[in-house]
Amino acid sequence: MQLKTLLTTIILAIIFLSFLLLNEFNLLSKKNDRELKNNTNFDSIVVLTGKFDRIKKGFELLEANYSKKMFISGVNPIVKKNELRKIIIPNNSTEKISLFDCCVFIGKEAKNTKTNAVEVIKWMKKNNLISVILVTSDIHLPRSILEFQNNTNHIKITSWPVKTNSNNFINFLKEFLRFSFVRIKYLIL
């Protein structure tokens, strides 16, 4: 009888914890529209590499004057800045090229979300920056925010999720499990 009660309690605790984590995951994956409307002058736009939609969205925010600087974290070490520019600006617009050349910075050290946070925080401290628009995919955003929040309390993050294929349940589940692992890890440590 006690074993049955213990198992029931454990299962209910897991369900409750999963519900809390799913709720937090859902909240963190949303765009902070209120913060974006109240502030159009951020210290930096930070893009975590992945699909090129993220980098293009970050550059659109730079063009819209949300910030004067954009940092792309986790760029493959063999990719040159001018190669990245050609992908983002395929039509060779002189104005866009000038903006890219002056205001886009790339980091090549990060290999995962945790090292993205470390790389970005290091760059922001070096440049005395505090507020940032964080651009990444909607399902990657919650874990990214956790990594940033748990590696510094000196920056103010406003999120800009880039929509992914929400029909892919496997990708959602993988990212939710990664998020849950990171959340529990930081709660324990």
Predicted regions and their residues:
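A transmembrane-helix-recognition feature enriched in membrane-embedded lipid enzymes
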Residues: 168-188
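Hydrophobic membrane-insertion alpha-helices, especially the h-region
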Residues: 6-23
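Positively charged n-region of N-terminal signal peptides that target proteins for export
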Residues: 1-5
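A structural signal for short, hydrophobic/glycine-enriched beta-strand patches
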Residues: 22-172
